[in-house]
Amino acid sequence: MTTTPSGDQNHTFRRYEDDDHDVDAWDEVIFQAGWSHKCPTYINKTPPCQGSCPSGHDIRGWLQIVRQLEKPTGDMDWQRYAFNRATDANPFPSMMGRVCPAPCEDGCNRNQVEDFVGINAVEQFIGDYAIEHGFEFEKCETTSDKKIAIIGGGPAGLAAAFQLRKLGHACTIFDDHEELGGMMRYGIPSYRTPRDTLDGEIQRIINMGVDVKLKTRVGKDVPMDDVEKEFDAIIWALGAKSGRPLPVPGADAPNCLSGVAFLEAFNEKRLQIVAKKVVVVGGGDTSIDVVSVARRLGHITEVHEKDSTENVVLGFTAHDVASTVVREGSTVTLTSLFPIENMTAAEHEVEDALREGVSIKGSVMPLEVMLDSEGRATGLRCCECTLDGNRPVATEGTEFTIEADIIVSAIGQSGDLTGLESMDNGHGFINSDKFYQVPDKPGHFLAGDIVRPHLLTTAIGQAAIAVESVQAYLDDQELSKRPKVDVHHFDLLHKLSEWNLSPEEHEAGESR
């Protein structure tokens, strides 16, 4: 949300004087930060945008390149130079530019002046330009005799493979789907993550020399013991693909579904229509994706039982009946424990859902799933509530029922550890220490939602830390506490190498 400057603020701290708001060119709207002391050149401390990014993006660095304040050497164009800098920490600029909720923009100093720098838009431009012009990552020779297994081919697993190949390690990704991508492919609606662009960003990583074993589930198709024997280290990047059911009576009805399963069925093109009345419980980004998909799909009046929403989502059928009938709009309602303005979903996503015709009820808690004589859900009984911390407190006398043909729970998710029960911490996740190691299991490391469901950029950042821990483990080095001091390390040798320069030899004379 934009923070405006106070009325008595000296206008010399801003770009414009009062009543002078003309913009000469579009790039001034985005790239005016360097003209104010509010966004200085950070040397001793991390810029607030970078400090707010879980993946550790050098955001200030690639923005400077795009603004032509830092120029490449030789015949490299600035687009390639910006791409190299932007992908040093995050190999998915096009995807992140589209779907990341941009904590970097929340941390931007320009919020104290007029509005944040449009970081997401610039990152998407860099990523899209790279796809259009066929940019590849540098070829990496396998200089190590170590092999690392990565269990899961989502953003965390792919980011780990990217970092491992840069270090010269051989790595193999095991994934139980037909295609790589994880939540980027199966958890986010395809209209938000164009498949050709996603495929291009994934293929770039595979082309670095990553081995892939698809439709292979460790713990079922391949015993974990066999993986431990074949590989020198394992990174668990399983994701969190099991949705949590509603903790209310009746939630086990056949037409009560999870948001994760709903979106996966849509992204696999199995789900073509939805029921007439859809109720979604949540308040986060997943719930917004579910209600938006439901509104866009709509329903038809005559549906064979095999083509009902729950049968398609649960994988019992995949008939495409929608192409021969007329669609009608579905009534879609989203309930949240939080007031609408405090929902965890991105504000612009909530606004988009409202514009698409979704009804959102804030400060509402579910009490019971209403069932018919056959045990199917017919509605959700709710009441108004307040929050005591994160605990909802029902407001007496405010009960009401929302009619529903299907009810979707998008209140959280956990990992599917079937066949890996020894790794389960009892909550559907795997325990991790501060170095993203599995406690008491040497050679086992973690990254992504299997640690704790969070942002895609968080999973990418965790993967980089896990790879650092893998390297220390392979080198038999003791891991030291990661510094929390907000200091940006300027790697002079890396910069000289990037500019094709070498430190000159010199003799040290007397110094006083």
Segments (PLM) and residue ranges:
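Mid-to-C-terminal Rossmann-like scaffold of FAD/NAD(P)H-dependent oxidoreductases
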Residues: 2-12, 16-19, 31-35, 39-41, ...
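Ferredoxin-type iron-sulfur electron-transfer modules in oxidoreductases and energy-metabolism complexes
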Residues: 20-40, 58-95, 113-140, 266-267, ...
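Beta1-alpha1 glycine-rich phosphate/pyrophosphate-binding loop at the start
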Residues: 26, 48-50, 57-74, 112-120, ...
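Short cysteine clusters
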Residues: 49, 53-56, 96-100, 104, ...
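Feature captures the FAD/FMN-dependent oxidoreductase FAD-binding
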Residues: 142-149, 199-249, 368-381, 406-408, ...
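Beta1/beta-strand and adjacent pyrophosphate-binding region of the FAD-binding site
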Residues: 142-156, 274-284
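FAD-site-proximal beta/loop scaffold in flavoenzymes
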Residues: 254-278, 284, 296, 369-373, ...
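A conserved FAD-binding loop/helix module that cradles the flavin
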Residues: 290, 304, 308-318, 447-480
